[in-house]
Amino acid sequence: MSSIDYDLKKIRGLVFDVDGVLSPAVIPMYPTGEPMRMVNIKDGYALQLALKHGYKIAILTGGNTKAVDVRFRGLGITDVFLGASIKLPIMQQWMRDNGL
């Protein structure tokens, strides 16, 4: 069994990518060439539960599809960053803005 040497109770925010994290690593394509992103219902429930318990949540993805925005905003996540090819500065700014 592994050991974690930090206090998980101090975690106040979570940042997630979509592709391969909140969706399968394989992305089917529509005939138009647009990616079809499939999401797991259980992930959505877990994200809503985390919000309910006061965690700050951000979605940070290089993809830029309306369906991704609609899905995560529909779960109550207000910080959805689409088209983020360079993610670190966006995440750092989000952390500063949220006191994390």
Language-model segment annotations:
Residues 1-16, 99:
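Non-catalytic pre-domain segments flanking phosphatase-related domains
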Residues 2-6, 47-48, 70, 96:
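Short, flexible, glycine/charge-rich loop motifs used to bind or transfer phosphoryl groups or to couple energy/partner
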Residues 9-22, 62-65:
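Short, compositionally biased "basic patch" segments
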Residues 13, 68-100:
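C-terminal cap/substrate-recognition subdomain and adjoining C-terminal extension
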Residues 18, 31, 97:
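Short, ordered coil/turn segments that flank beta-strands lining enzyme active or ligand-binding pockets
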Residues 22-53:
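A positional/architectural concept
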Residues 42, 63-64, 86:
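Short beta->alpha linker loops
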Residues 47-71, 81-82:
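Substrate-recognition element of Asp-dependent hydrolases with the DxDx(T/V) motif
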